[in-house]
């Protein structure tokens, strides 16, 4: 694909409208037959232990064993290398003809065996311009070797090991693929091959994950572009690559962007990005506080578009959405701290006061709080009544085979967005509110399907197909781990390891039948990779940097007794070694010559102005 131009699968530059990608297949011709990969004879996967992203494909045909290695050796140019090595069962001298190509362009070369091995043969694919459009050029090349520009880039990124091959692969693949999904200019499709559109929310979370995984460059590019191009002069944010009328504004996006900016700053120390873009940051913070967005009796934020983008046609009424209150409050809290770091005390005070009032109304208001029967609820109307169900517009173009149009009531709760205040510790994860909320979300596991996974919300109000959602399931996994239920987090990861796409660690938006049309076919969601990075770095390793303070609060999953990490942090590195205490072993933390007893709130360290390397050893229950 051209990274600067979104498109469906059929827009791939290697795709031919008649033959698909058949021309890219490789064949070997000897004196007796032509050999090629066949279904069932091929194994593909990430190359285990490689410091940079490499995919290995191994297949057999006749006497030949073929190993193909795919990788990108450059950071600044669009170049893919395909390294082909051949082996055979018999020794001796002989030759084969190797053929492959791209669309109408073919390549052939003669390969000589000396003994049982031959090669490697290097095929090089380059992204080139043909007028205003892009194309792929293919040629025979030379081996770039192991010390290339891309390898140097990946050497400086985060390294994490969890004593579990699946989780090690998930982390590495999430780190690799987040970078691959972002173009040089910062463009990023919300769902690869599916939507061909961009969202501030998704990209801000992805920028956070890039910073956590030691990739500040692309994180900065994304955030700078969002502030420049995706925040209007009034402070509204774009979703689906467009601005909407005020009633449809996805106000949580303003908060997520501000929250991501503070997280990026805490990880990188890059205050210049904040200073240079303060005018847009100020507008993004002020926008949700405009009078038209406020419920007069409570002060809470109102609109007619919910977190998952259902709106009036789906039966959503004007009201207060849980996730919108959450992220506006979290974002304003971040904006206030950013203002304080720039010496803008007036704005810091104003936004802090707004945070306190909104938080009090969200959690404590007897009529308007987003809590009912001791658990978080999704939505209230402007009169304070809980919006428990929806009735879709009978004249809408929504697909009639969806559960939303089935018989019976169409309920909004439970909704996995209710896990987010727990996952981000907006409320006490060990408290009764968190426990009751998480218990209510268990209705979404296997609600109308078999095999596991959480649906994004009550399936009876689903305008799409019933089925589990990977990134929504990770909301619950993160919240459960913070609440002390590590088995629920493990269950989600085990489920991700079973579903299609797990080998590549590239998951679809959801798993279920799709009404196509009117909806596009499902694609691969980059946000899922960000959620995995959050689970691994923020929750399991428990690394939470602040302005001048570092908190380390590690948590081990069932079946994992040891994990290590080497994480870039500002101008230095954080080295972390976490082990489960053996019988009779006293839990605690060691940092240099300091030894501290274990506490469930973890270890707190003051960050030096010039950070080089911090090494922490943790023995935890």
List each language-model region with its residue ranges.
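Terminal accessory carbohydrate-recognition/targeting modules of carbohydrate-active enzymes
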Residues: 1-166, 482-485, 525, 542-621
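Short beta-alpha connecting loops at secondary-structure transitions
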Residues: 109, 240-246, 311-314, 318, ...
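The feature captures the catalytic groove of carbohydrate-active enzymes
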Residues: 118-139, 190-192, 238-239, 244-255, ...
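Substrate-binding groove/exosite segments of carbohydrate-active enzymes
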Residues: 152-275, 320, 413-426, 453-483, ...
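Structural helix-adjacent loops and short alpha-helical linkers that scaffold large soluble proteins
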Residues: 160-168, 210-223, 264-282, 293-296, ...
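Generic recognition of stable, solvent-exposed alpha-helical segments in well-folded globular domains
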Residues: 169, 173, 201, 205, ...
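Active-site-adjacent bridging/hinge elements
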Residues: 176-187, 226-235, 258, 299-309, ...
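Non-catalytic carbohydrate-binding regions of carbohydrate-active enzymes
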Residues: 344-386, 429-575, 579-583
């Amino acid at each position: 694909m051209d990274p600067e131009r979104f498109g469906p699968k059929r827009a791939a530059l290697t795709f031919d409208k008649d033959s698909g990608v058949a021309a890219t297949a490789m064949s070997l011709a000897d004196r007796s037959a032509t050999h090629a990969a066949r279904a069932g004879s091929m194994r593909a996967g990430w190359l285990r232990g490689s410091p940079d992203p490499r995919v290995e494909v191994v297949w057999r045909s006749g006497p030949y064993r073929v190993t193909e290695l795919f990788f990108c050796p450059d950071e600044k140019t669009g170049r893919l290398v395909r390294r082909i090595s051949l082996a055979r069962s018999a020794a001796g001298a002989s030759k084969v003809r190797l053929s492959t190509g791209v669309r109408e362009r073919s390549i052939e070369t003669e390969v000589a065996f000396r003994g049982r091995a031959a090669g490697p043969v290097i095929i090089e694919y380059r992204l080139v311009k043909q007028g205003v459009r892009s194309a792929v050029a293919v040629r025979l090349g030379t081996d770039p070797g192991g010390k290339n520009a891309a390898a140097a880039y990946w050497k400086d990124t985060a390294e994490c090991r969890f004593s579990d091959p699946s989780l090690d692969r998930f982390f590495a693949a999430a780190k690799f693929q987040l970078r691959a999904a972002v173009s040089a200019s910062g463009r990023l499709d919300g769902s690869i091959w599916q939507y061909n559109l961009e969202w501030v929310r998704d990209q801000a979370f992805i920028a956070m994950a890039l910073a956590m995984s030691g990739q500040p460059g692309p994180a900065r590019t994304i955030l700078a572009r969002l502030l420049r191009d995706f925040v209007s002069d009034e402070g509204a944010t774009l979703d689906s690559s467009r601005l909407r009328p005020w009633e449809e504004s996805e106000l949580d996006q303003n908060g997520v962007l501000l929250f991501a900016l503070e997280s990026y700053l805490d990880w990188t120390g890059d205050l210049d990005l904040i200073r240079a873009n303060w005018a847009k940051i100020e507008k993004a913070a002020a926008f949700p506080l405009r009078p038209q967005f406020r419920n007069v009796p409570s002060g809470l934020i109102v609109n007619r578009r919910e977190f998952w983008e259902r709106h009036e046609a789906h039966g959503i009424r004007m009201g207060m959405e849980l996730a919108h209150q959450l992220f506006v409050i979290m974002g304003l809290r971040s904006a206030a701290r950013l203002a304080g770091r720039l010496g803008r005390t007036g704005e810091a005070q104003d936004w802090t006061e707004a945070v306190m009032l909104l938080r009090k109304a969200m959690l404590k208001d007897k009529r308007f709080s987003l809590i009912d029967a001791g658990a978080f609820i999704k939505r209230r109307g402007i009169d304070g009544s809980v919006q428990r169900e929806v009735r879709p517009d009978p004249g809408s173009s929504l697909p009639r085979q969806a559960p939303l149009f089935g018989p019976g009531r169409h309920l909004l709760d439970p909704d996995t967005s209710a896990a987010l205040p727990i996952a981000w510790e907006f409320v006490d994860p060990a408290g009764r509110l968190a426990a009751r909320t998480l218990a209510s979300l268990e209705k979404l596991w296997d609600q109308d399907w078999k095999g596991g996974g959480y649906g994004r919300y009550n399936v009876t109000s689903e305008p799409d197909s019933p089925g589990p959602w990977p990134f929504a399931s990770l909301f619950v996994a993160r919240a459960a781990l913070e609440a002390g239920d590590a088995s629920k987090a493990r269950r989600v990861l085990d489920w991700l390891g079973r579903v299609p796409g797990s080998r590549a660690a590239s998951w679809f938006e959801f798993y279920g039948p799709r009404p196509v049309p009117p909806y596009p076919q499902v694609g691969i969601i980059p946000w899922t990779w960000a959620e995995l990075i959050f689970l691994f770095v923020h929750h399991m390793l428990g690394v939470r940097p602040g302005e001048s303070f570092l908190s380390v609060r590690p948590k081990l999953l069932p079946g994992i007794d040891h994990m290590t990490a080497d994480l870039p942090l500002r101008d230095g590195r954080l080295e972390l070694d976490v082990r489960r205490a053996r019988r009779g072993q006293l839990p605690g933390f060691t940092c240099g010559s300091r030894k501290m007893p274990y506490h469930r709130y973890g270890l707190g360290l003051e960050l030096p102005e010039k950070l080089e390397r911090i090494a922490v050893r943790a023995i935890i229950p």
